[in-house]
């Protein structure tokens, strides 16, 4: 996905030898369907205070090191045309495939190698400083390992509990996931005529207020 490819690009740019393994024959499936197929690639209102977290300092650190403006600069470097839909939400004019192609090109520039349609079956410590990865296409020994499998929200795209199981195996603490984007299901028949209609609304909870449509 996007996070794994961005990580691979950064590591390759730092002159690390990088192998990106994905069980799918095509990478970037979630990118392809994001934003209705146009990829809502960033939000200019992405600020630390807009994140709910048990560690609020993490969002401050992460967003100060790589900002939405940095990604927009990358988009413009690849001549991808985009537009602002609402409240700082940026979408490609054409297709989400443009963002996938951009990330693949950046990976290639950073000399990242791809191993696609390759399932990771097991990970063990090869010794105190290395990992041994068992895959369908053979074993890999590496100094560093990043698991970027994403969440469990879209199982049909291949989402599994592999990352959680691996974290548990290596005694890495995992924060229990909570719903971040869920529908409101209303059974009142008198409201069925509103189905499919979007309109501006304001939602408040405690001291937080959200405006959207």
Residues of each region from the PLM?
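Predominantly flavin-linked oxidoreductase catalytic cores and closely associated redox partners
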Residues: 14, 23, 98, 102-213
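Short amphipathic alpha-helical segments
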Residues: 9-10, 32-33, 158-160
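Residue-level detector of alpha-helix initiation sites
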Residues: 1-3, 26, 151-153
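A short beta-to-alpha transition loop/helix N-cap that caps and shapes the active-site region
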Residues: 27-31
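Generic structural signal for well-ordered, non-membrane alpha-helical segments
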Residues: 52, 64, 68-71, 92, ...
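N-terminal Rossmann-like FAD-binding beta1-loop-alpha1 element of flavoenzymes
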Residues: 1-20
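Helix-loop-beta segment of a Rossmann-like dinucleotide-binding subdomain
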Residues: 53-59, 76-101, 132, 142-144, ...
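Glycine-rich active-site loop/strand segments that organize a redox cofactor
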Residues: 36-86
């Amino acid at each position: 996905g996007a996070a794994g490819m961005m990580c691979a690009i950064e590591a390759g740019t730092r002159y690390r030898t990088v192998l990106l393994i994905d069980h799918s024959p095509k990478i970037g499936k979630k990118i392809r369907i994001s934003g209705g197929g146009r990829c809502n690639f960033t939000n200019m209102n992405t600020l630390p205070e807009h994140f709910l977290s048990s560690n609020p300092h993490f969002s401050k650190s992460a967003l100060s090191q790589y900002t939405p403006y940095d990604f927009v600069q990358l988009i413009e470097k690849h001549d991808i045309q985009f537009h602002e839909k609402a409240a700082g939400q940026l979408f490609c004019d054409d297709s989400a495939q443009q963002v996938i192609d951009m990330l693949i090109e950046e990976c290639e520039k950073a000399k990242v190698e791809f191993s696609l349609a390759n399932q990771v079956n097991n990970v063990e410590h090869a010794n105190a400083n290395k990992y041994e990865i068992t895959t369908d296409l053979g074993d890999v020994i590496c100094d560093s390992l990043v698991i970027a499998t994403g969440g469990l929200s879209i199982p049909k795209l291949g989402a599994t509990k592999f990352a959680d199981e691996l974290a548990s195996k290596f005694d890495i603490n995992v924060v229990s996931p909570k719903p971040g984007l869920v529908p409101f299901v209303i059974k009142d028949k008198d409201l069925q005529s509103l189905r499919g209609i979007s309109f501006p609304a304001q939602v408040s909870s405690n001291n937080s207020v959200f405006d959207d449509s």
